[in-house]
Swiss-Prot record:
SUPFAM superfamilies in the record: Nucleic acid-binding proteins
One cellular-component annotation, GO: cytosolic small ribosomal subunit
Gene: rpsQ
Highest taxon, organism lineage: Bacteria
Role noted for this protein: One of the primary rRNA binding proteins, it binds specifically to the 5'-end of 16S ribosomal RNA.
CDD domains xrefs: Ribosomal_uS17
A Gene Ontology BP annotation from the UniProt entry: translation
Protein name: Small ribosomal subunit protein uS17
Length: 93
């Protein structure tokens, strides 16, 4: 008799992906990306622009200041890095 063990599938959970503009690349293998979002005020309904700056891991130092990039959420890589560079969408002019 053969036992059939269920296949163990370790699927990753949902990971966020953002687009933003590189504002700093002075660190080694790290870029700072500014991500903009629009949020509606809960009481008054006005649409406001919000922005946040996140540090992302850039393994090959490919992104430069002004580049439009896509980043994805990942495990903590350092005290402040929780994002990684997926691709450079558009180079700075």
């Amino acid at each position: 008799m053969t036992e059939q063990t269920p296949a163990v599938s370790e699927e990753r959970g949902y990971r966020k992906a953002l687009r933003g503009i590189v504002v700093s690349d002075k660190m080694d293998k790290t870029i700072v990306v500014e991500v903009q979002d629009r949020k509606k005020h809960s009481l008054y309904g006005k649409v406001m622009k919000t922005s946040k700056r996140v540090k992302a891991h850039d393994e090959e130092n490919t992104a430069g200041v002004g580049d439009r990039v896509r980043i994805a959420e990942t495990r903590p890589l350092s005290a402040s890095k929780r994002w990684r560079l997926v691709e450079v969408v558009e180079r700075a002019k």
